[in-house]
Amino acid sequence: QAVEVVVSRLSHAGNVQKSQSPRVQANGGNADTNGKKNDELAEYLEPNLMMNNADAKLIELARDAAGGEREPYALGDRLRRFVTDYVTTKNLNVGFATASEVARTREGDCSEHGVLLAALGRLNGLPSRVAVGIAYVPVFGGQDDIFGYHLWTQFYIDGRWVDFDAALRESDCSPIRITFAVSSLKNS
């Protein structure tokens, strides 16, 4: 059964493209998703309440963050590094902010880092979702050696979901995380 999806994303030239088709181009326009049908990945490229890919500020950030990179893993790493540096006020005072809100306030905790990173990935053609679980941190909130609740981003690259954690500054992350659930943050 064909599913029609409208996706806005940045072209490699930095222009906004809208596509409307039963299949969605994944990995920056490369249709090779190693056995996963593009329509199975459509949900991870679509906009939603948390990731408005028509937002001019997000489009600008996605273009700047990508810097012309096309190779999916290198692109994911560039985006992760960008978000790590872009969110300048690291705190727990923000609720679960949308990517558009984070783009403007530049503040938040792991959830804001994760949502912004997923949005920038989608705008650059990387299927993106968030993972929720716990992560080991050596020091947090005055405590040493703890596992704390955490949220990070996953990009679908070369036939698998790869962890990218802008809050903890890691790409293709070390095994300090335990995933409880994953989500596209699709509207309910």
Question: Where do the PLM segments sit?
Answer:
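Short C-terminal domain-edge/linker segments immediately following a structured domain
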Residues: N53-K57, S111-G114, S183-N187
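Weak global preference for isoleucine
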Residues: V3-V7, I59, L75, I134, ...
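Active-site neighborhood of thiol-dependent amide/isopeptide-bond enzymes
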Residues: G68-L151, D172-P175
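Acidic low-complexity segments
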Residues: A2-T105
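Generic structural hydrophobic/aromatic packing signal, biased to beta-strands
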Residues: Q1, V5-V7, A62, V130, ...
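A mature extracytoplasmic/lumenal domain signature
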Residues: R9, V132-I134, L168
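Active-site rim recognition segments
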Residues: G28-L41, L49, R81, L126, ...
